[in-house]
């Protein structure tokens, strides 16, 4: 067994040979390399598959033995300092290795078809393979300095992939925004690492955990200083995992290709922050004040992400805010000490969200022939609808991913989210209320995405009403792009055939000839008309969807209790995940060591599922085809007429819609306070530098020049005059000296 662990260092290095070969090929024989570019996908997938098999073997050994293996190499600088580096294999590492390799392989397979017509096909595969290498290196790191090194590589790869289509100004601005926002967290992480190195003289995890176990309880170290350094480490996780208030980069990261959006949101970049917090949880758990702050940040993030997803029109941005909210659940779980629940939700969410993002890519792929290749149209749910008839496989997989994220049993996210909700109620009723209410919101906005995309009728004709300036409203306004004033914010979607908005006083009127076009898109070619419909994607893109569907259906079983024998007349029940993980730092570990209370489990499950079903029902009323039924019966109109507070309710609806659609005005606040403030400070500094500093220097030079000119004319070039003035100055000097 130990012989196998000795070669675990190979796993992060396996994708590197293909990267190097593609680089050499593009440098030495660029024409041949580009002509044979589709061949390079096979070795990329093959080597990552080998890494997956190796990771699976390590995971099986971890489940059976739950042992921790660490290998270190020491590089001695001098007698007082040596740098150690190596790799660590424990249950957390094995979980992340399986997650990264499985999702990475499916994304690579999907990308082969999705990016096949892109000129940057080879560049994309180089970036994404290096992304996988960086993340694999991060999760196997044995100390903080190695984590920071791979942490920066992950950030660099995300910058390159978000700005992959860098010729588009919005994409270029989005990658800059992600880079600068993460710089804030990375700087905090670096300061935290340096702070703990100053305290302990080491960067190894075991020394940090020694602080938690021995020094802090015995007052052997300043707890305030330790809390400050730990907070700086947490700041790095806040930026990487898009937690409030450093979440603003995540929606704009959707400017990259859809496969990389799936990888970022499922298994790599945003998972890095959760991984760092889970890795250092033995340290954080000894600092109760910081743990409370972590849980508070997670609670704010999960609720904020859900509210911001309520009115988004871009399908990928809606899923991005969903990711932000689910990461908030994980952060909340870690903050209350529920280590197992957080990692369980990380696993289930990764496969469900990868399924949803790849499904959205399939939808975008099918819409592009109809509306064009601009993301403002191909990703706009205003123009979708009725796709269930045209892309049935994508629709089925997307529905399963949606229901999983809503928390509907027996799909994956039900088991993990229910565990987080239960633990939240045990820790604090306040956190429990917010988390449960957000679970209902999650069901609402996720089913809204599904209904607007697949239910009702195709709304391609609305592209005439969708101004291109609208894109600036949810694009990179933080980086100097003006916000359009001409957007109709009262335009709220429904999937019904005979109308466009609900609960709106001003319903846009659609010309009759336009209304007749619903269901198809007519493209004129001379005297003929070719009707273009959405179509299902190829098998290469459907295969990853079906595999992820299986994960979504069955991965939750690792958290289902099973019989583990009888002790003290009680049936002991464990889960595969509890055997996999080390439960010693889980504050709720007693649940895994005692008999399961079936009544309590059913009560919690019924409560969470009821909230989810209620959210689904409300979403179906607002956005589903059933709305046309209510409208035809005049049920809704009569209800509104009888309501004396109609204007107040309309105003509340508009405020909520405006809050959500404009990202809670957080980007606007950052623009006014930070971006414009820094620019004004830069202008003031520039003025001070040019007007004051340069003025003093130039003034001194000019004064010297003028004085010299005056003295030149006084002397006249005669030596006798120079001697006369010299003697005068000497006389005055001697006269004033006592």
From Swiss-Prot:
Topology relative to the membrane: Multi-pass membrane protein
GO cellular component, one term: chloroplast thylakoid membrane
Protein location: Plastid, Chloroplast thylakoid membrane
Listed GO MF terms: NADH dehydrogenase (ubiquinone) activity; quinone binding
InterPro entries found in the cross-reference section: NADH_UbQ_OxRdtase_chlpt_su5_C, NADHpl_OxRdtase_5_subgr, ND/Mrp_TM, NU5C-like, Proton_antipo_N
UniProt-listed Enzyme Commission number(s): 7.1.1.-
Reaction(s) the record says it catalyses: a plastoquinone + NADH + (n+1) H(+)(in) = a plastoquinol + NAD(+) + n H(+)(out); a plastoquinone + NADPH + (n+1) H(+)(in) = a plastoquinol + NADP(+) + n H(+)(out)
Segments crossing the lipid bilayer: 9-29, 39-59, 89-109, 125-145, 147-167, 185-205, 219-239, 258-278, 280-300, 327-347, 354-374, 396-416, 425-445, 542-562, 610-630, 691-711, 717-737
Keyword field: Chloroplast, Membrane, NAD, NADP, Plastid, Plastoquinone, Quinone, Thylakoid, Translocase, Transmembrane, Transmembrane helix, Transport
Superkingdom of origin organism: Eukaryota
Protein's UniProt keywords contain Transmembrane: yes
A Pfam family it matches: Proton_antipo_N
Biological process according to GO: ATP synthesis coupled electron transport; electron transport coupled proton transport
The family this protein is said to belong to: Belongs to the complex I subunit 5 family.
Record's function text: NDH shuttles electrons from NAD(P)H:plastoquinone, via FMN and iron-sulfur (Fe-S) centers, to quinones in the photosynthetic chain and possibly in a chloroplast respiratory chain. The immediate electron acceptor for the enzyme in this species is believed to be plastoquinone. Couples the redox reaction to proton translocation, and thus conserves the redox energy in a proton gradient.
Subunit structure: NDH is composed of at least 16 different subunits, 5 of which are encoded in the nucleus.
The protein's name: NAD(P)H-quinone oxidoreductase subunit 5, chloroplastic
Species this chain originates from: Saccharum hybrid
């Amino acid at each position: 067994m130990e012989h196998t662990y000795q070669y675990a260092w190979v796993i992060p290095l396996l994708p590197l040979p293909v990267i190097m070969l593609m680089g050499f090929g593009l440098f030495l024989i660029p024409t041949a390399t580009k002509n044979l570019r589709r061949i390079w996908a096979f070795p990329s997938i093959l080597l990552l598959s080998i890494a997956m098999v190796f990771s699976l073997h390590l995971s099986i050994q971890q489940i059976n033995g739950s042992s921790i293996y660490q290998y270190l190499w020491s590089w001695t600088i001098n007698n007082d300092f040596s740098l150690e580096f190596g790799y660590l294999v424990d249950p957390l590492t094995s979980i992340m290795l399986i997650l990264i390799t499985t999702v990475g392989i499916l994304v690579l397979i999907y990308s082969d078809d999705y990016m096949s017509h892109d000129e940057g096909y080879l560049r994309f595969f180089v970036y994404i393979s290096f992304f996988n290498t960086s993340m694999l290196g991060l999760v196997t790191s044995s100390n903080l300095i190695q984590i920071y090194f791979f942490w920066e590589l992950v950030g660099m790869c995300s910058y390159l992939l978000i700005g992959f289509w860098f010729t588009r100004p919005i994409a270029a601005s989005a990658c800059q925004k992600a880079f600068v926002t993460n710089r804030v967290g990375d700087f905090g992480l670096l300061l935290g690492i340096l702070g703990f190195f100053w305290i302990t003289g080491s960067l190894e995890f075991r020394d940090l955990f020694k602080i938690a176990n021995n020094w802090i309880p015995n007052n052997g170290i300043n707890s305030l200083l330790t809390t400050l350094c730990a907070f700086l480490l947490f700041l790095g996780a806040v930026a990487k995992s898009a937690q409030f208030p450093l979440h603003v980069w995540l929606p704009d990261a959707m400017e990259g290709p859809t496969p990389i959006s799936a990888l970022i949101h499922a298994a790599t970049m945003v998972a890095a922050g959760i991984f760092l917090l889970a890795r250092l949880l033995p340290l954080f758990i000894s600092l109760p004040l910081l743990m409370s702050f972590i849980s508070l940040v997670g609670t704010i993030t999960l609720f904020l992400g859900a509210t911001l997803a309520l009115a988004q029109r871009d399908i990928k941005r809606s899923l991005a805010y969903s990711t932000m909210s689910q990461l908030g659940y994980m952060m909340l779980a870690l903050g209350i000490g529920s280590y197992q629940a957080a990692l369980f939700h990380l696993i289930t969410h990764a496969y469900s969200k990868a399924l949803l993002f790849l499904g959205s890519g399939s939808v975008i792929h099918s819409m592009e022939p109809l509306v064009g290749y601009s993301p403002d149209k191909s990703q706009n749910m205003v123009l979708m609808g009725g796709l269930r008839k045209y892309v049935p496989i994508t629709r089925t997989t997307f529905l399963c991913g949606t229901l999983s994220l809503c928390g509907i049993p027996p799909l994956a996210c039900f088991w993990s989210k229910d565990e987080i909700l239960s633990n939240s109620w045990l820790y604090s009723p306040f956190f429990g209320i917010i988390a449960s209410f957000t679970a209902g919101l999650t069901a609402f906005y996720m089913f809204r995405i599904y209904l607007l995309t697949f239910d009702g009728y195709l709304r391609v004709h609305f592209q005439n009403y969708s101004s291109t300036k609208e894109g600036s409203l949810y694009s990179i306004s933080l980086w100097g792009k003006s916000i359009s004033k001409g957007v109709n914010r009262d335009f709220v979607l429904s999937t019904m055939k005979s109308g466009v908005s609900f609960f709106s006083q001003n319903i846009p009127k659609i010309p009759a000839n336009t209304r007749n076009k619903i269901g198809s898109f007519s493209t004129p070619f001379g005297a003929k008309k070719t009707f273009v419909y959405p179509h299902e994607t190829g098998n290469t893109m459907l295969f990853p969807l079906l595999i992820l569907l299986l994960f979504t259906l069955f991965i939750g079983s690792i958290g289902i209790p099973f019989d583990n024998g009888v002790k003290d007349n009680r049936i002991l029940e464990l889960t595969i995940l509890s055997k996999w993980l080390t439960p010693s730092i889980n504050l709720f570990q007693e649940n895994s060591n005692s008999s399961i209370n079936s009544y309590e489990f059913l009560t919690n499950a019924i409560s969470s599922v009821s909230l989810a079903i209620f959210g689904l029902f409300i979403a179906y009323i607002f956005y589903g085809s059933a709305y046309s039924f209510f409208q035809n019966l005049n049920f809704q109109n009569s209800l509104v007429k009888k309501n004396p507070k109609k204007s107040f309710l309309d105003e509340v609806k508009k405020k909520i819609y405006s809050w959500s659609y404009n990202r809670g005005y957080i980007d606007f606040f950052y623009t006014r306070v930070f971006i414009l403030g820094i620019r004004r400070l830069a202008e003031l500094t520039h003025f001070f530098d040019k007007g004051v500093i340069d003025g003093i220097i130039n003034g001194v030079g000019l004064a010297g020049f003028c004085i010299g000119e005056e003295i030149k004319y006084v002397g006249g070039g005669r030596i006798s005059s120079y001697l006369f003035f010299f003697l005068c100055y000497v006389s005055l000097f001697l006269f004033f000296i006592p």
